[in-house]
A protein has these predicted regions:
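N-terminal amphipathic/hydrophobic targeting modules at extreme N-termini
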Residues: 2-9, 15-17
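Alpha/beta catalytic cores of nucleotide-metabolism and tRNA/nucleoside-modifying enzymes
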Residues: 3-6, 21, 26-38, 54-59, ...
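Conserved N-terminal beta1-alpha1 strand-loop-helix module at the mouth
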Residues: 18, 27-126, 162, 170-177
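Hydrophobic faces of well-ordered beta-strands that scaffold small-molecule active sites
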Residues: 47-51, 80, 99-103, 132-134, ...
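Glycine-rich phosphate-binding active-site loops on the catalytic face of alpha/beta enzymes
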Residues: 52-54, 107, 127-141, 183-194, ...
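Active-site-adjacent beta->alpha loops and helix N-cap segments on the catalytic face
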Residues: 59-61, 81-97, 112-117, 136-154, ...
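Conserved, mostly hydrophobic/aromatic
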Residues: 72, 91, 183, 230, ...
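Structural motif
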Residues: 75, 94, 127, 157, ...
């Protein structure tokens, strides 16, 4: 996979506008937007860890997930991504770093599974998530709700910071235009849109070059060199999950190596 040969210049001139500094006064929109920007400012240049456990395993409990979060923060993580209302609530009791919360729902009525419902967004905020991750692809949500309508519903109810999980530059540009606060490459390779082998660092570079909001590199990061490359092309922060926090898949990887030898 080809990468850009030089770092991509980042444009975050949106920050002063969000803080309501233009015109010499603060309005309600500017204040709420500034607070959301602050959540991502805290994540700039560091590692976010996705704390998780395979469904149905003995470690799939809020107590374990929160202990896992506490451990990675002690090791230097500056943010946590976590699935599930109770997991988020438990994590917030243990760590002081920003938490990106989401709810995974696998529904028969929609291919969207990352925070597909408005109630999920509101409950995550109530549980303490400073940032809520949502599927920002152009697929329909339950009951035929478009992404545009979903964002409208969210902003009618809450000013919580929204991280848009996307699969393409087109989805990212739409998410930015609808007021999402940052973009993550989480869904690259997980929809019908073709993508190169993960991690999709090329997409990170394209997003960083074209967007005015932070870009979170996520999906398939297993090596330090990959993380460094993502930062080099313009990532605001990098989120790593399985390579750090999934002992089930890591154990399977080594066991399969033994069986295949």
């Amino acid at each position: 996979m080809g990468h850009r040969s030089r770092p991509v210049a980042q444009n975050y001139s949106m920050v002063p506008r969000c803080q309501g500094l233009e015109g010499g006064h603060l309005d309600n929109f500017s204040v709420s937007k500034a607070l959301r920007v602050d959540q991502f400012t805290a994540l700039k240049g560091g590692l976010v860890v996705s704390c998780q456990a395979p469904t149905g395993t003995a470690i799939d409990t809020p107590a374990f997930i929160s202990a896992q979060a506490q451990t990675v923060v002690q090791a230097g993580a500056i943010g946590i991504r976590a699935q599930g209302i109770e997991n988020v609530r438990a994590i917030k009791k243990q760590v002081g770093v920003p938490v990106i919360g989401l709810v995974k729902r696998y529904l028969d009525t929609s291919a969207v599974y990352i925070t597909p419902l408005l109630d999920d967004v509101l409950e995550l905020e109530q549980a303490g998530a400073e940032i809520v991750a949502i599927d920002a692809t152009q697929r329909l949500r339950p009951n035929g709700v478009t992404f545009e309508k979903f964002m409208e519903q969210i902003r009618e109810k809450t000013d919580v910071a929204i991280l848009a999980d996307v699969d393409s530059i087109e989805s990212a540009l739409l998410a930015q235009s609808l007021g999402c606060d940052a973009i993550a490459t989480t869904l690259s390779g997980y929809t019908e849109i073709a993508a190169p082998e993960l991690p999709n660092i090329e997409l990170v570079a394209e997003l960083a070059a074209q967007l005015k909001i932070p870009v979170v590199a996520e999906g398939g990061y297993h090596e330090r060199e990959q993380v460094a490359q993502a930062f080099k092309v313009g990532a605001w922060t990098v989120c790593v999950g399985t390579a750090i926090t999934n002992p089930y898949l890591l154990t399977q990887h080594f066991v399969n190596g033994i069986l295949e030898s």
